[in-house]
Amino acid sequence: MADSALTPGFSCYLKNLFAAHHLDIAVLGCYLNLATPDQAVLEKNVHRYMAHIRMASLLGAGVVGTETGAVNESYSFEERNHSEEALDIFIKNVRPVVQYAEKMGVILAIEPVYKHIVCNPKRARKVLDEIGSPNLQIIFDPVNLLDISNYKERESIIAEAIEVLGEDIAVIHIKDFIVKDGALVSVAVGTGEMDYTQIIRFIKEKKPYIHTTLENTTPENAVQAKAYIQKLYDTCQIK
């Protein structure tokens, strides 16, 4: 759909449709590469982010969500994604998008992913601090911070994310993972190796009613996944 099709009328139609079913629009996704070396593509991507931000302001969406890109045109992993140069490129290119979000009263939320430029909590913290805007926040997807090289340290990685980013977490993605053929494969929560106790406690203690969305479910396991995480929430004891 063209950016020009994201009109106020279309936005109001969708807002009313969701409201009629008592549904929030938690995240309006715009997952494009803000670090592409192709300047023409970058300009097009920035324009599309701004169109989504305008639409989000009319939809009443919680956030416009994005990941943080790669230093190549294919949006694929390479070691340079984890360099300081790559982080500087992303910060430079996301800054005008955040400034536009400020004008429109919308939150842009970045999602750290191990294979992308913002690959860990410390790099995410640096982006937040460099930009210095309350309109830039975090989508916390714990599985996306993991890789075959670090998944056994997931409890400490999650703890670090909560400590370093907790105040700025606006949305939480809930999924699970299994190890298959030497790689992590994302699956529905409750069907893999993740322990969500630490995250559920964080939600209950610090983030009441935060938008928390299930990922990697199927029609066959979606209800079971919701029941699994709901039970963890209901039985979690906090002081």
Locations of regions flagged by a protein language model:
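Acidic/histidine-rich catalytic cores of soluble enzymes
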Residues: 28, 91-193
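Acidic-and-aromatic substrate-binding clefts and catalytic sites of carbohydrate-active enzymes
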Residues: 1-10, 33-39, 72-78, 115-120, ...
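H/E-rich (His + Asp/Glu) clusters that bind or coordinate divalent metals
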Residues: 189-192, 198-206, 210-213
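Short secondary-structure boundary segments
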Residues: 68, 176, 216
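C-terminal helical cap(s) of enzyme catalytic domains, especially alpha/beta-barrels
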Residues: 222-239
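Hydrophobic residues within beta-strands of alpha/beta enzymes
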Residues: 26-28, 64, 172, 212
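Active-site acidic/histidine proton-transfer and metal-coordination neighborhood
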Residues: 12, 17-20, 36-138
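A structural motif
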Residues: 23, 56, 61, 169, ...
